[in-house]
Protein backbone atom coordinates (compact mmCIF):
# COMPACT_ATOMS: atom_id res chain seq x y z
CA UNK A 1 0.00 0.00 0.00
CA UNK A 2 1.15 3.56 -0.80
CA UNK A 3 0.53 6.78 1.09
CA UNK A 4 1.65 10.19 -0.12
CA UNK A 5 2.03 11.49 3.42
CA UNK A 6 2.28 10.25 6.99
CA UNK A 7 -1.28 10.39 8.33
CA UNK A 8 -3.91 8.26 10.09
CA UNK A 9 -1.64 5.29 10.79
CA UNK A 10 -2.08 2.93 13.71
CA UNK A 11 1.56 2.33 14.59
CA UNK A 12 0.64 -0.60 16.83
CA UNK A 13 0.06 -2.59 13.64
CA UNK A 14 3.67 -2.20 12.51
CA UNK A 15 6.41 -3.64 14.74
CA UNK A 16 9.15 -2.46 12.35
CA UNK A 17 9.75 0.97 10.80
CA UNK A 18 12.27 1.14 7.95
CA UNK A 19 13.54 4.50 6.72
CA UNK A 20 14.83 4.55 3.14
CA UNK A 21 13.72 2.70 0.01
CA UNK A 22 17.01 1.91 -1.68
CA UNK A 23 18.32 -1.66 -1.98
CA UNK A 24 18.91 -1.91 1.79
CA UNK A 25 15.46 -0.70 2.86
CA UNK A 26 13.37 -2.48 0.25
CA UNK A 27 15.28 -5.75 0.69
CA UNK A 28 14.74 -5.71 4.46
CA UNK A 29 11.02 -4.96 3.99
CA UNK A 30 10.58 -7.79 1.48
CA UNK A 31 12.33 -10.28 3.75
CA UNK A 32 10.20 -9.30 6.74
CA UNK A 33 7.08 -9.58 4.58
CA UNK A 34 7.98 -13.22 3.82
CA UNK A 35 7.95 -13.87 7.55
CA UNK A 36 4.52 -12.22 7.84
CA UNK A 37 5.93 -9.23 9.73
CA UNK A 38 4.29 -5.89 9.01
CA UNK A 39 6.52 -2.88 8.49
CA UNK A 40 6.32 0.78 7.65
CA UNK A 41 8.61 1.72 4.77
CA UNK A 42 9.22 5.46 4.80
CA UNK A 43 10.78 7.45 1.94
CA UNK A 44 11.86 11.09 2.09
CA UNK A 45 11.29 11.63 -1.63
CA UNK A 46 8.40 10.96 -3.96
CA UNK A 47 7.71 8.19 -6.42
CA UNK A 48 9.74 9.96 -9.11
CA UNK A 49 12.71 12.30 -9.34
CA UNK A 50 12.37 15.99 -8.57
CA UNK A 51 14.92 18.79 -8.36
CA UNK A 52 13.18 20.13 -5.27
CA UNK A 53 13.69 16.86 -3.44
CA UNK A 54 17.29 16.50 -4.62
CA UNK A 55 18.14 19.90 -3.11
CA UNK A 56 17.90 18.29 0.35
CA UNK A 57 21.02 16.29 -0.54
CA UNK A 58 23.30 19.29 -0.88
CA UNK A 59 26.59 19.14 0.94
CA UNK A 60 30.10 20.52 0.95
CA UNK A 61 33.21 18.46 0.17
CA UNK A 62 36.49 19.53 1.72
CA UNK A 63 39.66 17.96 0.30
CA UNK A 64 39.65 16.03 -2.97
CA UNK A 65 36.96 17.42 -5.21
CA UNK A 66 34.44 14.73 -6.05
CA UNK A 67 31.01 14.95 -7.61
CA UNK A 68 28.51 17.24 -5.91
CA UNK A 69 26.72 15.29 -3.18
CA UNK A 70 23.29 16.13 -4.58
CA UNK A 71 24.05 14.56 -7.96
CA UNK A 72 25.56 11.19 -7.04
CA UNK A 73 22.59 9.81 -5.06
CA UNK A 74 18.80 9.89 -5.51
CA UNK A 75 16.15 11.03 -3.04
CA UNK A 76 13.17 9.09 -4.40
CA UNK A 77 11.55 5.67 -4.37
CA UNK A 78 14.24 3.09 -5.07
CA UNK A 79 17.02 5.37 -3.91
CA UNK A 80 20.28 5.44 -5.80
CA UNK A 81 19.48 2.11 -7.47
CA UNK A 82 17.85 4.39 -10.05
CA UNK A 83 21.30 5.31 -11.38
CA UNK A 84 23.58 2.45 -10.30
CA UNK A 85 25.81 0.69 -12.80
CA UNK A 86 24.46 -2.79 -12.10
CA UNK A 87 27.80 -4.59 -11.71
CA UNK A 88 27.43 -7.22 -9.01
CA UNK A 89 29.82 -9.53 -7.22
CA UNK A 90 30.54 -10.70 -3.66
CA UNK A 91 33.45 -9.05 -1.92
CA UNK A 92 36.66 -11.09 -1.68
CA UNK A 93 36.95 -13.23 1.46
CA UNK A 94 40.11 -11.37 2.48
CA UNK A 95 38.19 -8.06 2.41
CA UNK A 96 36.44 -9.21 5.59
CA UNK A 97 39.65 -9.60 7.63
CA UNK A 98 38.85 -6.48 9.67
CA UNK A 99 35.09 -7.12 9.94
CA UNK A 100 33.40 -8.68 13.00
CA UNK A 101 31.78 -11.16 10.62
CA UNK A 102 33.30 -13.07 7.73
CA UNK A 103 32.38 -13.74 4.12
CA UNK A 104 31.09 -17.18 5.13
CA UNK A 105 28.53 -15.48 7.38
CA UNK A 106 26.96 -13.94 4.27
CA UNK A 107 27.24 -16.89 1.89
CA UNK A 108 23.82 -18.27 2.83
CA UNK A 109 22.20 -15.05 1.55
CA UNK A 110 23.90 -15.13 -1.86
CA UNK A 111 21.20 -16.93 -3.84
CA UNK A 112 18.53 -14.62 -2.43
CA UNK A 113 20.64 -11.59 -3.37
CA UNK A 114 21.00 -12.90 -6.92
CA UNK A 115 17.25 -13.44 -7.19
CA UNK A 116 16.56 -9.89 -6.04
CA UNK A 117 19.04 -8.57 -8.62
CA UNK A 118 17.84 -10.91 -11.41
CA UNK A 119 21.35 -12.23 -12.01
CA UNK A 120 22.94 -15.65 -12.27
CA UNK A 121 24.48 -17.12 -9.15
CA UNK A 122 27.84 -17.46 -10.88
CA UNK A 123 30.99 -15.56 -9.95
CA UNK A 124 33.80 -17.58 -11.44
CA UNK A 125 37.50 -16.89 -11.11
CA UNK A 126 40.51 -18.26 -12.94
CA UNK A 127 44.09 -17.99 -11.69
CA UNK A 128 46.58 -16.16 -13.92
CA UNK A 129 49.51 -16.56 -11.54
CA UNK A 130 50.17 -16.30 -7.80
CA UNK A 131 49.15 -12.60 -7.81
CA UNK A 132 46.14 -12.24 -10.16
CA UNK A 133 42.80 -13.78 -11.04
CA UNK A 134 40.58 -13.28 -14.02
CA UNK A 135 37.22 -12.62 -12.36
CA UNK A 136 33.58 -12.52 -13.35
CA UNK A 137 30.93 -9.96 -12.44
CA UNK A 138 27.23 -10.31 -13.15
CA UNK A 139 25.32 -7.34 -14.53
CA UNK A 140 21.92 -6.46 -13.06
CA UNK A 141 19.40 -4.26 -14.85
CA UNK A 142 17.17 -4.04 -11.78
CA UNK A 143 15.86 -0.67 -10.70
CA UNK A 144 14.27 -1.26 -7.31
CA UNK A 145 11.41 1.20 -7.79
CA UNK A 146 10.44 -0.31 -11.13
CA UNK A 147 10.77 -3.94 -10.05
CA UNK A 148 9.08 -3.76 -6.65
CA UNK A 149 6.66 -0.81 -6.83
CA UNK A 150 3.57 -2.82 -7.74
CA UNK A 151 4.48 -5.58 -5.33
CA UNK A 152 4.67 -3.09 -2.46
CA UNK A 153 1.42 -1.41 -3.54
CA UNK A 154 -0.37 -4.74 -3.32
CA UNK A 155 1.32 -5.94 -0.14
CA UNK A 156 -0.69 -6.52 3.02
CA UNK A 157 2.45 -6.35 5.16
CA UNK A 158 4.30 -3.32 3.77
CA UNK A 159 2.93 0.21 4.06
CA UNK A 160 5.01 2.64 2.01
CA UNK A 161 4.84 6.32 2.98
CA UNK A 162 6.36 8.85 0.58
CA UNK A 163 7.39 12.50 1.03
CA UNK A 164 8.32 11.94 4.66
CA UNK A 165 11.75 13.00 5.86
CA UNK A 166 13.27 11.35 8.91
CA UNK A 167 14.82 14.04 11.09
CA UNK A 168 16.05 12.20 14.19
CA UNK A 169 15.29 9.57 16.80
CA UNK A 170 14.16 10.11 20.38
CA UNK A 171 14.92 7.58 23.07
CA UNK A 172 15.90 7.00 26.67
CA UNK A 173 17.52 4.24 28.71
CA UNK A 174 19.06 2.57 25.65
CA UNK A 175 15.72 2.27 23.86
CA UNK A 176 14.39 4.17 20.84
CA UNK A 177 10.89 5.44 21.58
CA UNK A 178 9.97 7.12 18.31
CA UNK A 179 11.29 8.75 15.17
CA UNK A 180 10.63 12.41 14.43
CA UNK A 181 9.56 12.80 10.81
CA UNK A 182 8.40 15.73 8.69
CA UNK A 183 5.64 14.97 6.21
CA UNK A 184 4.16 17.77 4.10
CA UNK A 185 5.97 20.19 6.46
CA UNK A 186 4.10 18.75 9.46
CA UNK A 187 6.14 17.14 12.25
CA UNK A 188 5.00 13.61 13.10
CA UNK A 189 6.09 10.85 15.45
CA UNK A 190 6.61 7.28 14.23
CA UNK A 191 6.54 4.53 16.85
CA UNK A 192 7.70 0.92 16.45
CA UNK A 193 9.38 -1.92 18.31
CA UNK A 194 12.36 -1.86 15.97
CA UNK A 195 13.73 0.94 13.80
CA UNK A 196 15.92 0.45 10.72
CA UNK A 197 17.87 3.39 9.31
CA UNK A 198 18.56 2.65 5.63
CA UNK A 199 18.96 6.09 4.08
CA UNK A 200 22.31 5.66 2.34
CA UNK A 201 26.04 6.09 2.83
CA UNK A 202 25.80 9.77 3.75
CA UNK A 203 22.33 10.23 5.22
CA UNK A 204 22.76 7.43 7.76
CA UNK A 205 25.61 9.36 9.39
CA UNK A 206 23.79 12.67 9.01
CA UNK A 207 20.67 11.43 10.80
CA UNK A 208 22.58 9.77 13.64
CA UNK A 209 24.72 12.88 14.16
CA UNK A 210 21.58 15.03 14.26
CA UNK A 211 19.96 12.58 16.68
CA UNK A 212 22.94 12.93 18.99
CA UNK A 213 22.52 16.71 18.97
CA UNK A 214 18.73 16.72 19.37
CA UNK A 215 18.54 13.97 22.01
CA UNK A 216 21.74 14.35 23.99
CA UNK A 217 22.74 11.34 26.05
CA UNK A 218 20.78 8.87 23.93
CA UNK A 219 23.54 7.95 21.47
CA UNK A 220 26.95 7.42 23.03
CA UNK A 221 29.19 10.45 22.46
CA UNK A 222 32.14 8.15 21.82
CA UNK A 223 30.68 6.38 18.79
CA UNK A 224 32.69 7.36 15.67
CA UNK A 225 29.61 8.36 13.67
CA UNK A 226 30.52 9.78 10.28
CA UNK A 227 34.16 8.66 10.50
CA UNK A 228 36.04 6.20 8.27
CA UNK A 229 34.08 7.29 5.19
CA UNK A 230 35.25 5.64 1.98
CA UNK A 231 34.58 5.41 -1.72
CA UNK A 232 36.02 3.57 -4.71
CA UNK A 233 38.27 5.78 -6.80
CA UNK A 234 37.38 4.89 -10.39
CA UNK A 235 40.26 5.92 -12.61
CA UNK A 236 41.66 5.64 -16.11
CA UNK A 237 44.88 3.77 -15.33
CA UNK A 238 46.41 3.56 -18.79
CA UNK A 239 46.02 1.70 -22.07
CA UNK A 240 46.84 -1.83 -23.02
CA UNK A 241 46.63 -4.77 -25.35
CA UNK A 242 45.81 -8.33 -24.31
CA UNK A 243 46.45 -11.26 -26.64
CA UNK A 244 43.27 -13.24 -26.12
CA UNK A 245 44.62 -16.31 -27.90
CA UNK A 246 47.69 -16.50 -25.66
CA UNK A 247 45.66 -15.68 -22.57
CA UNK A 248 43.30 -18.57 -23.33
CA UNK A 249 46.26 -20.88 -23.89
CA UNK A 250 47.83 -19.82 -20.59
CA UNK A 251 44.58 -20.49 -18.73
CA UNK A 252 44.01 -23.71 -20.71
CA UNK A 253 40.38 -24.68 -20.13
CA UNK A 254 39.85 -22.09 -17.41
CA UNK A 255 39.52 -18.90 -19.46
CA UNK A 256 36.26 -17.19 -18.51
CA UNK A 257 34.05 -16.45 -21.50
CA UNK A 258 31.33 -13.92 -20.69
CA UNK A 259 29.72 -10.77 -22.00
CA UNK A 260 31.11 -7.51 -20.72
CA UNK A 261 34.53 -6.18 -19.80
CA UNK A 262 37.54 -8.39 -19.18
CA UNK A 263 38.30 -8.15 -15.44
CA UNK A 264 41.46 -8.92 -13.47
CA UNK A 265 41.77 -8.62 -9.68
CA UNK A 266 44.49 -8.88 -7.07
CA UNK A 267 44.88 -12.01 -5.00
CA UNK A 268 45.62 -11.84 -1.31
CA UNK A 269 49.20 -12.91 -2.09
CA UNK A 270 49.81 -9.70 -4.05
CA UNK A 271 48.29 -7.58 -1.31
CA UNK A 272 50.41 -9.24 1.36
CA UNK A 273 53.60 -9.26 -0.69
CA UNK A 274 53.44 -5.64 -1.83
CA UNK A 275 51.62 -4.34 1.27
CA UNK A 276 48.87 -2.74 -0.79
CA UNK A 277 45.07 -2.61 -0.83
CA UNK A 278 42.77 -4.60 -3.10
CA UNK A 279 42.07 -3.43 -6.63
CA UNK A 280 40.78 -4.61 -9.98
CA UNK A 281 41.16 -3.50 -13.59
CA UNK A 282 39.00 -3.99 -16.62
CA UNK A 283 39.09 -3.45 -20.35
CA UNK A 284 35.93 -2.97 -22.39
CA UNK A 285 34.57 -5.95 -24.25
CA UNK A 286 34.57 -4.13 -27.58
CA UNK A 287 37.88 -2.88 -28.88
CA UNK A 288 38.22 0.88 -28.97
CA UNK A 289 39.42 1.45 -32.54
CA UNK A 290 40.64 4.97 -31.79
CA UNK A 291 42.67 3.71 -28.83
CA UNK A 292 44.23 0.72 -30.54
CA UNK A 293 45.25 2.79 -33.56
CA UNK A 294 47.01 5.17 -31.19
CA UNK A 295 48.65 2.24 -29.36
CA UNK A 296 49.90 0.69 -32.61
CA UNK A 297 51.20 4.04 -33.82
CA UNK A 298 53.22 4.51 -30.63
CA UNK A 299 54.59 0.95 -30.74
CA UNK A 300 55.62 1.32 -34.38
CA UNK A 301 57.67 4.39 -33.43
CA UNK A 302 59.74 2.60 -30.79
CA UNK A 303 59.61 -1.05 -31.94
CA UNK A 304 58.66 -1.30 -35.64
CA UNK A 305 58.84 -5.09 -35.95
CA UNK A 306 56.78 -5.70 -32.81
CA UNK A 307 54.35 -3.03 -34.00
CA UNK A 308 53.84 -4.89 -37.28
CA UNK A 309 53.21 -8.09 -35.33
CA UNK A 310 50.63 -6.31 -33.18
CA UNK A 311 48.93 -4.90 -36.27
CA UNK A 312 48.54 -8.37 -37.78
CA UNK A 313 47.03 -9.73 -34.56
CA UNK A 314 44.55 -6.85 -34.38
CA UNK A 315 43.19 -7.65 -37.80
CA UNK A 316 42.94 -11.33 -36.82
CA UNK A 317 40.89 -10.26 -33.77
CA UNK A 318 43.46 -11.92 -31.49
CA UNK A 319 43.94 -8.77 -29.43
CA UNK A 320 41.82 -6.82 -26.99
CA UNK A 321 42.92 -3.19 -27.12
CA UNK A 322 41.76 -0.19 -25.18
CA UNK A 323 41.67 1.86 -22.03
CA UNK A 324 42.41 0.20 -18.71
CA UNK A 325 39.97 1.29 -16.01
CA UNK A 326 40.56 0.62 -12.35
CA UNK A 327 38.69 0.41 -9.04
CA UNK A 328 40.97 0.92 -6.03
CA UNK A 329 40.16 0.19 -2.41
CA UNK A 330 40.58 2.95 0.16
CA UNK A 331 41.97 2.27 3.61
CA UNK A 332 39.66 3.28 6.49
CA UNK A 333 40.78 6.69 7.76
CA UNK A 334 39.03 8.46 10.62
CA UNK A 335 39.92 11.84 9.08
CA UNK A 336 37.72 11.02 6.08
CA UNK A 337 34.46 11.88 7.76
CA UNK A 338 30.99 13.39 7.65
CA UNK A 339 30.06 16.18 10.05
CA UNK A 340 27.06 18.50 10.28
CA UNK A 341 27.49 21.93 8.74
CA UNK A 342 25.97 25.21 9.87
CA UNK A 343 23.70 25.60 6.85
CA UNK A 344 20.32 23.86 7.12
CA UNK A 345 17.72 22.60 4.68
CA UNK A 346 14.26 24.17 4.58
CA UNK A 347 13.01 21.71 7.20
CA UNK A 348 15.71 22.71 9.66
CA UNK A 349 18.13 19.79 9.34
CA UNK A 350 21.85 20.60 8.85
CA UNK A 351 23.48 19.79 5.54
CA UNK A 352 26.64 17.70 5.74
CA UNK A 353 30.29 18.52 5.30
CA UNK A 354 32.38 15.68 3.93
CA UNK A 355 36.11 15.69 4.61
CA UNK A 356 37.64 13.41 2.01
CA UNK A 357 41.16 12.86 0.72
CA UNK A 358 42.57 9.87 -1.14
CA UNK A 359 45.48 8.37 0.75
CA UNK A 360 48.97 7.73 -0.57
CA UNK A 361 48.24 4.10 0.28
CA UNK A 362 45.61 4.01 -2.50
CA UNK A 363 47.94 5.79 -4.93
CA UNK A 364 50.68 3.28 -4.17
CA UNK A 365 48.20 0.42 -4.63
CA UNK A 366 47.32 1.53 -8.16
CA UNK A 367 50.97 1.90 -9.14
CA UNK A 368 52.25 -1.41 -7.75
CA UNK A 369 49.22 -3.37 -8.97
CA UNK A 370 49.70 -2.09 -12.52
CA UNK A 371 53.46 -2.56 -12.50
CA UNK A 372 53.08 -6.17 -11.37
CA UNK A 373 50.35 -6.82 -13.93
CA UNK A 374 52.58 -5.29 -16.61
CA UNK A 375 55.40 -7.63 -15.55
CA UNK A 376 53.04 -10.58 -15.94
CA UNK A 377 52.04 -9.45 -19.43
CA UNK A 378 55.69 -9.23 -20.53
CA UNK A 379 56.85 -12.43 -18.80
CA UNK A 380 54.09 -14.57 -20.31
CA UNK A 381 53.85 -12.48 -23.49
CA UNK A 382 50.08 -12.11 -23.17
CA UNK A 383 50.08 -8.37 -23.88
CA UNK A 384 51.50 -5.00 -22.97
CA UNK A 385 50.22 -2.10 -20.87
CA UNK A 386 51.20 1.56 -20.64
CA UNK A 387 50.58 3.08 -17.22
CA UNK A 388 49.59 6.73 -16.98
CA UNK A 389 52.43 9.01 -15.91
CA UNK A 390 50.30 10.47 -13.12
CA UNK A 391 50.04 7.02 -11.52
CA UNK A 392 53.78 6.42 -11.85
CA UNK A 393 54.33 9.76 -10.13
CA UNK A 394 51.80 9.02 -7.34
CA UNK A 395 49.79 12.11 -8.27
CA UNK A 396 46.24 12.53 -6.97
CA UNK A 397 43.71 10.45 -8.88
CA UNK A 398 41.57 12.10 -11.50
CA UNK A 399 38.25 10.48 -10.60
CA UNK A 400 36.03 9.47 -13.50
CA UNK A 401 32.30 10.03 -13.33
CA UNK A 402 30.21 10.45 -10.17
CA UNK A 403 31.50 9.15 -6.84
CA UNK A 404 28.53 6.91 -6.05
CA UNK A 405 29.99 4.24 -3.78
CA UNK A 406 29.49 5.81 -0.36
CA UNK A 407 30.79 3.51 2.37
CA UNK A 408 31.64 3.82 6.04
CA UNK A 409 30.46 6.33 8.62
CA UNK A 410 28.48 3.82 10.70
CA UNK A 411 31.06 1.04 10.50
CA UNK A 412 30.53 -2.37 12.00
CA UNK A 413 32.63 -3.65 14.90
CA UNK A 414 32.80 -5.30 18.29
CA UNK A 415 33.08 -2.22 20.49
CA UNK A 416 32.00 1.41 20.62
CA UNK A 417 35.52 2.86 20.39
CA UNK A 418 36.05 2.13 16.71
CA UNK A 419 32.58 1.23 15.41
CA UNK A 420 28.95 2.34 15.47
CA UNK A 421 27.02 -0.92 14.96
CA UNK A 422 27.63 -4.52 15.97
CA UNK A 423 27.84 -7.52 13.63
CA UNK A 424 24.02 -7.65 13.52
CA UNK A 425 23.89 -3.99 12.39
CA UNK A 426 22.43 -2.82 15.72
CA UNK A 427 23.72 0.49 17.10
CA UNK A 428 25.93 -0.08 20.13
CA UNK A 429 24.11 0.30 23.45
CA UNK A 430 20.70 0.91 21.85
CA UNK A 431 18.36 -2.06 22.02
CA UNK A 432 16.13 -1.46 19.01
CA UNK A 433 17.91 0.78 16.48
CA UNK A 434 19.55 -0.78 13.42
CA UNK A 435 21.46 0.67 10.48
CA UNK A 436 21.44 -0.94 7.05
CA UNK A 437 23.57 -0.17 4.02
CA UNK A 438 27.14 0.40 2.91
CA UNK A 439 27.69 2.93 5.70
CA UNK A 440 28.24 -0.19 7.84
CA UNK A 441 31.18 -1.36 5.72
CA UNK A 442 34.46 -1.70 7.59
CA UNK A 443 36.43 -1.99 4.37
CA UNK A 444 35.22 -1.57 0.81
CA UNK A 445 37.38 -3.85 -1.31
CA UNK A 446 37.20 -3.16 -5.04
CA UNK A 447 33.70 -4.55 -5.64
CA UNK A 448 30.58 -2.46 -6.23
CA UNK A 449 28.76 -2.43 -2.87
CA UNK A 450 25.13 -3.19 -3.79
CA UNK A 451 25.42 -6.99 -3.73
CA UNK A 452 26.91 -6.92 -0.22
CA UNK A 453 24.34 -4.33 0.90
CA UNK A 454 21.58 -6.77 -0.06
CA UNK A 455 23.24 -9.71 1.71
CA UNK A 456 23.54 -7.65 4.90
CA UNK A 457 19.92 -6.43 4.63
CA UNK A 458 18.64 -10.01 4.35
CA UNK A 459 20.69 -10.94 7.40
CA UNK A 460 19.38 -7.92 9.34
CA UNK A 461 15.77 -8.90 8.61
CA UNK A 462 16.56 -12.40 9.85
CA UNK A 463 17.94 -11.02 13.13
CA UNK A 464 14.88 -8.81 13.69
CA UNK A 465 12.60 -11.76 12.98
CA UNK A 466 14.48 -13.83 15.58
CA UNK A 467 14.05 -11.10 18.18
CA UNK A 468 10.35 -10.65 17.45
CA UNK A 469 9.79 -14.37 17.98
CA UNK A 470 11.97 -14.81 21.04
Which residues make up each language-model segment?
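A glycine-rich dinucleotide-binding beta-alpha-beta segment and adjacent secondary-structure elements
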Residues: 161-172, 319-328, 350-357, 361-443, ...
Amino acid sequence: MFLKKLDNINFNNFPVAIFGTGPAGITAALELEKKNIKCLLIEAGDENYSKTSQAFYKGKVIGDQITDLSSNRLRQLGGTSGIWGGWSKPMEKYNFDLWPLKANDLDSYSKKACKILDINYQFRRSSLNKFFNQIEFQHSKVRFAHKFKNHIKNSNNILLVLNTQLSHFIGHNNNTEYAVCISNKVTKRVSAKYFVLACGGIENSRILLWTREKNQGFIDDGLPIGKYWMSHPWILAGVGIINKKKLKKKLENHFLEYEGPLHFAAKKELISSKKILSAAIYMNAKEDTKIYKEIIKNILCVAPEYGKKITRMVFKKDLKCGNIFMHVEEAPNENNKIILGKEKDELGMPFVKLFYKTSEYSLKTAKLFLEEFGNLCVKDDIGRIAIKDSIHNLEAFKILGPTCHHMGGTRMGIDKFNSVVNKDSKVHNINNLYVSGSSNFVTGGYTNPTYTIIQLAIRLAEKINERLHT
